[in-house]
Amino acid sequence: LRIVIVTHVVRHNDGQGRVNYEIARAALAEDYEVTLVASHVAPELLANHRVRWVPVKVGRFWPSNLVRQQVFALKSAWWLRAHRGEYDVLHVNGFISWIRADVNTAHFVHGGWFKSPYYPFGLTKGLWSAYQYVYTRVNTALERWAYRRSRAITAVSQKVADEIRGLGIDGGKISVIYNGVDAGAFADAQPDRAAFALPADAFLLLFVGDLRTPRKNLGTVLKALTTLPENVHLAVAGYLPGSPYPDEARALGLGKRVHFLGLVRNMPTLMRSVDAYVFPSRYEAMSLSLLEAMAAGLPVVTARTAGGAEIITRECGIVLDDPDDPAALAQAIGTLAASRDACRAMGAAARDLMSRFGWAHMGAQYVALYRRIGQPSQPTAFGHVEHAVTQEQS
């Protein structure tokens, strides 16, 4: 089979990019030919002679992400239409190109985020808020257009699948394929608190996510921490410039108990160095970091508003009904902190659960879907990089 995957980046250190990276690897393992229509592709994939890269260059001079995404959508569609005879299965990700697709993977549903009671943006709340509101509304319309024109839709969680149905999309063509996780890398890492300057004797929580917006809900975690014993500390990993949370932590008197680490490259070691993972996100499609934490053997505290919470059992975590209830969050954390043995037992159950969510398992499901949709074609020879249509003019 000849597969085309359309996505902005294909690399192992990006959420959506990692998913497509592993899908490409799974397809190559079946001796399929893979064309990647993307702005960036990991060099190790390009070393494979069955990989062709169609680089879609989008200049940073375009005034906003909304415009840049349209440039990508138009350029990719031009190439795909011009080369329609060169592939059997077209796999896209949400709205990303002005073209009908065979497979469409939904990583995030803008319409679901807009309907969430925690959606914070509006036209009358300032220029940035107004832009975010317009961005969401435009993308809601675009994703509905894309899903209606896709033969098969794969959602990364049941929450995402339900939200796509809420857009009026035929549920018969929607299936759930959960993202994978490198279970071995996280389970086999060695703890090293000293490497992150973390206290050796504290009961240590971990929060990973975007620290510049309230959606991930670090604020509620900080409020909960104020009511917990002094030996309960919090490590926070995420991009710090522009974040209000360091000041908020100091204002709450938590300056010595909250450890802001910035961006962390060695996440397996960090996750193996803490006691539990806390992630009461107000809205999440499917969190890779949640899966990684469980693979590292951490019990998790999350909320029903976070996609992926549906897979968490009582044996391996605690799922809250309300992400904005600091008292309930504190009680859940306190339950874990009160018994290290029970905490470790829940972590072991989490690790066992993640053994069934490997990247290979995810990739095999996409390969099976490709087989059902595509028809074998005679292989064609091509080089690694296609420049004709998609290069930005200088």
Predicted feature residues:
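Aromatic "clamp/platform" in nucleotide-sugar-dependent glycosyltransferases that forms part
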Residues: L263, R282
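A short helix/loop element that forms part of the nucleotide-sugar donor recognition site in Leloir-type
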Residues: A187-P199, A342, P379-H384
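A short, well-ordered alpha-helix in the C-terminal region of glycosyltransferases
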Residues: T335, A342-R356, Q365-A368
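A short, active-site helix/loop in glycosyltransferases that binds the activated sugar's phosphate group
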Residues: R144-V176, V181-A185
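A conserved mid-protein helix/loop that constitutes part of the nucleotide-sugar donor-binding site
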Residues: G17-E22, F203, F207, R212-T227
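Short hydrophobic beta-strand element within catalytic cores of glycosyltransferases
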Residues: P299-T302
